Amino acid sequence: MQHANTTALYLIGSDESGKGDSFGGIAVSAVLIHKDKINTLHQIGVGDSKQFNDYQIKALVPKIKAAVHDQVTLSVDAKTYNQLVQSFKNVNVMLTFLHCKVYHQLLQQNKLTAQQCDISIDEFANVKLFTQYTQKLTSLQNELKELVIPNHFLIRGESYSKVIAAASILARAAFIAQMEQLSHQYGVQFPKGSAHGIVEALHLLKTKRQFHKFAQYSAVCKTTFKNVASFLKQLA
């Protein structure tokens, strides 16, 4: 954890969803709220997204959007996810890029600087590693002029920070929508997670949708996951 920005008038929280799922890409969200309004998130029932089912998540989305000052969500499909991982050579560098991107958009939309905000992230890397990842990004891309480093890195942050919890719910809602769109497009009920039913679903795509090429699978699943990569080797 870094030092809190005690003079900040605004709080920002960010989290991602889909990171551990074999199918689909990933969604990253950040929310901005005035420090004096943080109790509103408690009043509307914001909590750890893992405690809510999909229906409850969807019901909370409009309430959160109405309660916060602003929010940004990036829904990255599987094809783009795989391209980014290949480009950045490291999943955590890619995650750093996506979190920095939602911070950048949120600050830009509201004409704020990072110094005016107290920023919290659900920790996927500690501050030292996150800083190293931003240094790698500086040499890899020029899209973001400023790479913001959060003030707080919280393990299971959605359990301790309402602003992270709100971002977590928005990210999960976006990932749910992404998975529902995939299922509708391909006529296959894609399993969640990265263990149960994954190989069976990959086989189903082969038999039901005539998937025979790596590029076809890369549009629906994370090709670097071990069980997916093992299956894809059989296509060669």
UniProtKB/Swiss-Prot annotation:
Main location, first listed in the record: cytoplasm
GO BP annotation list: DNA replication, removal of RNA primer; mismatch repair
Entry annotated with the keyword Metal-binding: yes
Chain sites annotated for binding a divalent metal cation: 15-16, 122
Cofactor(s) annotated in UniProt: a divalent metal cation
EC number: 3.1.26.4
Annotated InterPro entries: RNase_HII/HIII, RNase_HII/HIII_dom, RNaseH-like_sf, RNaseH_sf
Reaction(s) this enzyme catalyzes, per UniProt: Endonucleolytic cleavage to 5'-phosphomonoester
GO molecular function: metal ion binding; RNA binding; RNA-DNA hybrid ribonuclease activity
Domain RNase H type-2: start-end pairs: 9-236
One Pfam family hit: RNase_HII
Record keywords, A-Z: Cytoplasm, Endonuclease, Hydrolase, Metal-binding, Nuclease
Cofactor binding note of this UniProt entry: Manganese or magnesium. Binds 1 divalent metal ion per monomer in the absence of substrate. May bind a second metal ion after substrate binding.
Compartments, record wording: Cytoplasm
A GO cellular component entry from the record: ribonuclease H2 complex
Known function: Endonuclease that specifically degrades the RNA of RNA-DNA hybrids.
Protein name: Ribonuclease HIII
Organism for this UniProt entry: Mycoplasma pneumoniae (strain ATCC 29342 / M129 / Subtype 1)
GN (gene name): rnhC
